[in-house]
Each structure stands twice: as structure tokens, then as C-alpha cells.
């Protein structure tokens, strides 16, 4: 089968106006970025709120492995399949970050015959949203240091400036820096550092804001420093929010593209799920629900991270409730969770599959704990055997009382996921019940962290370092105790040890730091060795990305 990029280039794309027409979006509501990408105007989006929303379908997955699960591919394939069986469906995805594109992961627009296109533009600069978010964040950083330089009327303590800088690249050398060296004219020297753009609170605010007014209000709430007498300083205090909103105005309009089968997809916002809340924008999701009968969206990494945050943060803030949840699994990944080395995954191994099934079982059980109907989508790989698929379906049926459906959308497009689509429609017929959240907002911040760790991760308890515990107490004293928790931890395990696969129990979840994201409306708990600025691997994907003799990109996929 051709590579993903070859398949994408061979596709005949519809003019974006034709894709919009399927949804009833008029030409004057589109801001075109070439022939195949458009932003949907703020005014048109606002006018959709009076419409009755359709059904929301969440796609999540088992704990990811290097063997790959294909969550985005399944999201796209399911959206195409729902359209094929006559259900008007919108797909809502996150925008890819440049860092992972050039690092370990490569592109992030689906794969095989279940892709969103134009793939190269989506994976690289797209419509410039990440540039706008990086610029707005950088403007705030410049205004903070400028305020300190010119008299410091707010009495900001330069030892307690919490606002780090960002860049949309994996660059470990920037994690800790010293700035303002070179003399008096350059300001006051202090320690600083960079995070990747997708970890910026501006990105989180961007993705949780309902509209421009809400965006500006949330930006104003962001706590960026403390004074010498330990009072909190916000972006509103340094008069940053108006100019930042101007930089983000056009970016906040969701991006409309299409699948290989010509179906609509909104791709907007892109916070990571291991160091942020991992969901596309509220604006895009709400627009999708009002433009289509079904909206299929994904949450990053495994259900312990992306889905939990989708339900406990995004749904809580935006008033959303999924009608059905698809948990993506592969035979290969489950065998890896069962102890098989990656180089041996092509061989049939029923025993390892059954052992690794514990990972899928915990994710499904956790999601049912939220009160949600679940179906398992088994992403088919050519080396899988019929016996392995039969065993997985048997395990799901007998141990979980859940249906597992083999999907071949990577090879066949939407036609390969029609059985999954019909199962989703069946699950979605009942009126969704209120979500049973992992914790109550009135609980103490420490108790919320403990609830996530013990209920969802299988931990015996949590261990919060002294400095982090003191910060949590301060957050509660300052009136932020009601906020939900955003866990920042490895995506590869239920624990904080990325090598502990399967479904570990009795471990301790260590919290080494916490950060207040008052604008986004959550508290980040940083666990284990997770970094908010990733590094590149020994052999980054960038090593093989180039332009060929015809000026086309080679190696992105």
C-alpha cells in the first residue's frame, strides 16, 4: 500500500466551499486559505448557538505504545463511516504541533485511507494559529519584563515570575535559561525557561474559551507573578489582554478542511494531553454539534489522560456530554502491554494478548465509571491473526460485557468502519445521562489528585512533595480550591513510570510540582519526570524530511 503522503497527494480534493455547502455554511462565512482550507467567521459561529446540538462521540484509546494505536485514524475513519451510512457527521480534531512532527511522532492527520487533507499544510504551518498563540504568549512575556524594567509599579518580585516563554519546537536546551544578561540596558537578570507552545496556558485558554469576550476575560485571569508581599499578579494587571486578544482574533475562528472522502473536519487548537488538557477547541466542538447530527472528536493519548480531562475539565466547563465513547485498541499494542518486544509483535501470541488485555479492561471500566456507553474499536493490522481478533472479542464480551469491533479504515477508508459506525449509532440512541465525574469540585485539591490516582490509575496513594503541597495550600487560600485538576504525567503507563505497562496496581503517584492555570480554570499537577518542554529523540523525524527535486515534501509521513 502507498505511504500516507502518497495517498494524500493522489486524492482529488473538493473546493472547500463545496465541503462547507454540505453543512449549509454560506460562502460569505468562510475566510479561505487557498482552495482547500477555510476559517469559519466568528459571526456565523455565534449564530449557530440557537440550533439544537447533535450527538457527541468521543474517541479515546488504551495507553499508547511505540506499536501505535491509530486513534486519529479511527476518528477520521469513523466520521467517514457515519457519513457513508447516512448520518451527517463532523469530525473535530486538534492541530498538530511542529515539535512532534520533527521529533518522534511525525505528522498527525490520520493515516492510510482515513486522513484529513491537505495533510502537509495541516501538519506544518496550517493557518498560523500556533504562530498567533506563540506570539500572544511572547507578547505577555515581553510586557511583564518591560513593566519590571520601567519602575515596576506593581512591585513584582522577579524571583516569583511564573510566566515562562514558549516555542513550538522540541528543544531541551531551553528548559532552563538565564535572561537579561549583558548590562543594565537589558533589564534585570533572572532565571527563566521555555515550554512548548502546546503547554502554554494561552493554548489552554484558547481551547476552552466560548468566544472572543470569554477569551479576553480568561486571559485577564492568568496569574503570571507574585509581588514582594506575595499578592498575585495577573495579565490584566500588566494590561496585556487587549493586545493578546487582537493577536488571537483570527486564530480563534475554527479551521474547516476535509477527509479523503470529502467529509468535513474542523481542526482547531492543540494542547497536549500529557502536559495539558489534550482536547480541541470548545468553539469547534460546539460548532460541529450544531452543524451536524454527529460530531466525532478525540482526546489525546490514553483514556487515563485525554478522556479524563475531556470529561472532568472540558465537558464540565462547556456543558457537553458524550452520547458514546469509542476506545481504540490494537492487537499489537495489547501484546506489547503483555510483555512482547516490539520486534516480535508480528508473531501470534494469545497469552500475551490476554495479559495485555488488562490495560484495555481498566480503560473501559474507568469510562463506564463516568456513566458512559462504550464500544471497543480494534484497529486492524496486516500481521494480526483471526485467532487473536476472536480472542479479544471473547475477552471483551465475557469480562467486560462490551462489544469489540474489528475496523479496517486504514486500508479501506470509511467502508472499513461501517460496523463500528452502526454500533455507535445504536449506543447513541438513549439520551445521555449526566457524567459521573471522578471528583467533586468542592473537594480539596489534594483529594482531587488522590481520586484520579486511586480511582483511575490503580494507585495505592499519592505522594506530594513539600513544595508542591505548600503551593496547593496557597492556591486554596487564594480562592482556587474549586478548580479541577489537570494531571501532567507520562502517557505510556497508568503509573508515573513509563516502563510499567499493562494495568499496574498499588503504586504511588508522586507529584513533584503544581501550577495554577487560573485563566484556563484548572490546577496542573506535574507527576514523575514529565517535562513541559520535550526534547528530540536520538534520531528525530527531521533527519529524513526534505524537499525532493520537484519541490515536494518527502519524509513527513
Swiss-Prot record:
Which residues make up the binding site for ATP?
65-72
Class of the enzyme per the UniProt entry, highest EC level: ligase
Q: Which GO terms describe its molecular function?
A: ATP binding; formate-tetrahydrofolate ligase activity
Q: Which InterPro entries match?
A: Formate_THF_ligase, Formate_THF_ligase_CS, P-loop_NTPase
> Matching SUPFAM superfamilies, A to Z?
P-loop containing nucleoside triphosphate hydrolases
**Family, as annotated:** Belongs to the formate--tetrahydrofolate ligase family.
* Annotated protein name in UniProt: Formate--tetrahydrofolate ligase
UniProt organism field: Methylobacterium radiotolerans (strain ATCC 27329 / DSM 1819 / JCM 2831 / NBRC 15690 / NCIMB 10815 / 0-1)
Source taxonomy: Bacteria, Pseudomonadati, Pseudomonadota, Alphaproteobacteria, Hyphomicrobiales
Amino acid at each position: 500500500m502507498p505511504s500516507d503522503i502518497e495517498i494524500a497527494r493522489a486524492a482529488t480534493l473538493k473546493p472547500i466551499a463545496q465541503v462547507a455547502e454540505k453543512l449549509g455554511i454560506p460562502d460569505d462565512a468562510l475566510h479561505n486559505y487557498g482552495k482547500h482550507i477555510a476559517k469559519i467567521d466568528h459571526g456565523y459561529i455565534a449564530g449557530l448557538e440557537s440550533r439544537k446540538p447533535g450527538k457527541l462521540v468521543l474517541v479515546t484509546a488504551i495507553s499508547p505504545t511505540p506499536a501505535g494505536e491509530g486513534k486519529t485514524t479511527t476518528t477520521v475513519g469513523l466520521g467517514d463511516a457515519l457519513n457513508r451510512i447516512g448520518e451527517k457527521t463532523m469530525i473535530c480534531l486538534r492541530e498538530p504541533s511542529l515539535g512532534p512532527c520533527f521529533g518522534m511522532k511525525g505528522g498527525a492527520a490520520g493515516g492510510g485511507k482515513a486522513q484529513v487533507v491537505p495533510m502537509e499544510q495541516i501538519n506544518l504551518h496550517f493557518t498560523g494559529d500556533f504562530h498567533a498563540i506563540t506570539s500572544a504568549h511572547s507578547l505577555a512575556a515581553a510586557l511583564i519584563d518591560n513593566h519590571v524594567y520601567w519602575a515596576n509599579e506593581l512591585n513584582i518580585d522577579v524571583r516569583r515570575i511564573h510566566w515562562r516563554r514558549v516555542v513550538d519546537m522540541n528543544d531541551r536546551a531551553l528548559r532552563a535559561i538565564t535572561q537579561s544578561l549583558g548590562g543594565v540596558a537589558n533589564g534585570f537578570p533572572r532565571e527563566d525557561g521555555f515550554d512548548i507552545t502546546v503547554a502554554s496556558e494561552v493554548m489552554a485558554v484558547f481551547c476552552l474559551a466560548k468566544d472572543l469576550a470569554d477569551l479576553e476575560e480568561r486571559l485577564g485571569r492568568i496569574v503570571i507573578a507574585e509581588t514582594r508581599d506575595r499578592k498575585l499578579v495577573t495579565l490584566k494587571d500588566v494590561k496585556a489582554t487587549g493586545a493578546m486578544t487582537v493577536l488571537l482574533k483570527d486564530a480563534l475562528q475554527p479551521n474547516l478542511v476535509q477527509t479523503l472522502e470529502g467529509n468535513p473536519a474542523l481542526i482547531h487548537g492543540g494542547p497536549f494531553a500529557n502536559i495539558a488538557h489534550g482536547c480541541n477547541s470548545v468553539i469547534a466542538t460546539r460548532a460541529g454539534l450544531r452543524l451536524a447530527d454527529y460530531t466525532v472528536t478525540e482526546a489525546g493519548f490514553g483514556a487515563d489522560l485525554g478522556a479524563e480531562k475531556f470529561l472532568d475539565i472540558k465537558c464540565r466547563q462547556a456543558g457537553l456530554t458524550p452520547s458514546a465513547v469509542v476506545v481504540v485498541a490494537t492487537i499489537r499494542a495489547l501484546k506489547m502491554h503483555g510483555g512482547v518486544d516490539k520486534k516480535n509483535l508480528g508473531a501470534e501470541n494469545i497469552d500475551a494478548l490476554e495479559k495485555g488485555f488488562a490495560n484495555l479492561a481498566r480503560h473501559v471500566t474507568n469510562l463506564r465509571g463516568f456513566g458512559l456507553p462504550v464500544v471497543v474499536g480494534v484497529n486492524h493490522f496486516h500481521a494480526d491473526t483471526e485467532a487473536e481478533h476472536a480472542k479479544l472479542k471473547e475477552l471483551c464480551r465475557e469480562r467486560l460485557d462490551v462489544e469489540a469491533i474489528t475496523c479496517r479504515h486504514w486500508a479501506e477508508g470509511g467502508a472499513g468502519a461501517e460496523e463500528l459506525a452502526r454500533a455507535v449509532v445504536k449506543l447513541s440512541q438513549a439520551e445521555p445521562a449526566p457524567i459521573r465525574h471522578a471528583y467533586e469540585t468542592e473537594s480539596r485539591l489534594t483529594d482531587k489528585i488522590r481520586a484520579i490516582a486511586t480511582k483511575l490509575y490503580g494507585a495505592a496513594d499519592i505522594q506530594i512533595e513539600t513544595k508542591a503541597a505548600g503551593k496547593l495550600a496557597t492556591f486554596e487560600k487564594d480562592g482556587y480550591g474549586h478548580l479541577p485538576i489537570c494531571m501532567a504525567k507520562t502517557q505510556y503507563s497508568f503509573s508515573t513510570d513509563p516502563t510499567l505497562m499493562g494495568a499496574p496496581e498499588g503504586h504511588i503517584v508522586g507529584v513533584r510540582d503544581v501550577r495554577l492555570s487560573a485563566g484556563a480554570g484548572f490546577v496542573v499537577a506535574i507527576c514523575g519526570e514529565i517535562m513541559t518542554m520535550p526534547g528530540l529523540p536520538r534520531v528525530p523525524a527531521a533527519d529524513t524530511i526534505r524537499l525532493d527535486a520537484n519541490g515536494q515534501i518527502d519524509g513527513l509521513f
